[in-house]
Amino acid sequence: MKTNLTAQVSIDFRAPKARVWKALTDPTDIRQYFFGTNLVTEWIVGGPIRFVGEWEGKSYEDKGTVLKFDPQKMLQYDYWSSLSGKEDKQENYRMITYRMTEKDGITNVQIFQDGETEEAREHSEQSWKMVLEGIRNLVEK
């Protein structure tokens, strides 16, 4: 079974790059579209990142490390999910990368999630599409 596949989604927003970047990095904004999760991080490269919340009645705490933080261009972190059923060790962490571009008032965001099986990739792409639509509802108001 392949586990080196990459989930990839992309969306255009009719919103300024600065507003979309805020939606991707501000804990208050994130809580509104990311299934109610509480983000805990200072966005320092090498620093921790945590997503804490409840999913379908079960508490979770996903954690990882901020790998890249280039404001309004790129954001990257790895993470492990307590809901994954996998042991908390580096080989079970996934890498998430956000890339942003803007042209003529349209901001494009691409999200990549590495290290997926075929089934997990499809699930991840569907989840990220829901997240991006939630961001759209927030930034295009």
Stretch-by-stretch model annotation:
Residues 49-51, 74-78, 109-111:
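Short hydrophobic/aromatic-rich beta-strand segments that constitute the beta-sheet cores
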Residues 23-24, 69:
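Conserved catalytic core of Hanks-type protein kinase domains
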Residues 8-9, 28-61, 72:
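Short beta-edge strand/loop motif at the mouth of beta-sheet-based domains
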Residues 115-141:
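A conserved amphipathic terminal alpha-helix motif
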Residues 1-4, 52:
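Extracellular beta-rich ligand/substrate-recognition surface
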Residues 5-13:
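Short amphipathic
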Residues 39-42, 58-104, 114:
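Hydrophobic-ligand binding "helix-grip"
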